[in-house]
Amino acid sequence: MIKIYNTLTREKEVFTPIEARKVRMYVCGPTVYNYIHIGNARSAIAFDTIRRYFEYRGYEVNYVSNFTDVDDKIIKAAKELKITAPEVAERFIKAFEEDTQALNVQPATLHPRVMDHMPDILAFIEVLIEKGFAYEVAGDVYYRTRKFPNYGKLSHQSIDELEVGASQRTGVEQQLKEDPLDFALWKSAKEDEISWDSPWGKGRPGWHIECSVMATKHLEETIDIHGGGQDLEFPHHENEIAQSEAKTGHTFANYWMHNGYVTIGEDDEKMSKSLGNFITVHEMIQKVDPQILRFFMSTTQYRRPIRYSESTLKEAAANYQKLKNAFENLRFRQADAVASLPEDEHYLAQLNELEQRFITEMDDDFNAANGITVVYELAKMMNQYSEQATVSEPVLVAMDKLFSGWLAIFGLFFKNEELVDAQVDALIEERNQARKDRDFARSDEIRDLLKEQGIVLEDTPQGTRWRRSE
């Protein structure tokens, strides 16, 4: 059974879906005003892996992740780029899709956009006003934080603790509020800013209301899982709970999941645009195979921080190559496999035992770090089996299926390089013939040519194998 660490309770809990074998999951998506950096990509990759594991375990996942296409940062970017806010959003939604596709992140079941939900947002706010949870002042609408009795339950903060911080804020907005703790649901329009008509005058929605509206519209009033980065726990997710539960009277999400940061530098600073210590995915995938970056990001337990450095990335690349070599060794032996061998049942039983161990590790709050350790064990077993003089098709097929299935959970695959492979095979065949003809000069020439292309040859009793160098 799958256990999830629930931020709400600070405990691991057995996952019990609202509807049997189905998962309703909402994850906060990007604010689309720039290219995403690898810290942003952590969330997309973490929840893609979680989604894939649910599917591996037989669940049907309805996965909704939004695009925030209305925001102060987008308005600022529009002014700097001298284009409209919708044009900024469209440009960077496309960039996000290209970057995540390169990282083999599956598109969500639905990617709703704020601009497409204005009538829903207005209706949601009106209900909160009618219930006394919100009020209008000077064209702005604010949420009455103290009216929601359980405010602070997600971040485990009391109203008194929050009040100390809020009382130190200044500005016109603070003067308009009934209480420093109140937060904006609707912001009145400023000159030359994108805006929409509302019962309170022209304006645009606050950040927190958007996710409450889109989650409850597309996944019902109560959802199984709400996820996002740790930095969203407060105030964003806390405010989502207050808004949603005040409107519906029901629990908003049963499980709250938060992924860890990507850190960088000797002080392990959180990677962020505000600190200027970030590397965009767009830049990174020009230098590094996106699959290696995906591997680097996928194989740490999602709640743990990932320390980015040249050395940790190189280590990931080396481990990825070891898995690829094991896969290529296995595929190499398929051509000469026999129909069956007496020891087949022994190997198939070992594979079944490995699969159960993998499931046990991943069922424990999607512990990818422990899960990938089992993948390494399978790779070692594959290498040892491939070295045998005689191998059987049933064992090769079972190993291939298990290995490929596990890699898919982590969003990994080995690129189809059939044309290149065919060229390599042709050169190896020519080299073999040259050796038979005792034309060692040509044999060495072919070996050197392949080496220059990153192809390493290994002459074995079963024939010449090749692999791409690390």
Swiss-Prot record:
Binding site for ATP: 273
Subcellular location: Cytoplasm
Record-level GO cellular component terms: cytosol
Protein name: Cysteine--tRNA ligase
Binding site for Zn(2+): 28, 211, 236, 240
EC id: 6.1.1.16
Motif ('HIGH' region): 30-40
Family label: Belongs to the class-I aminoacyl-tRNA synthetase family.
Short sequence motif 'KMSKS' region: positions: 270-274
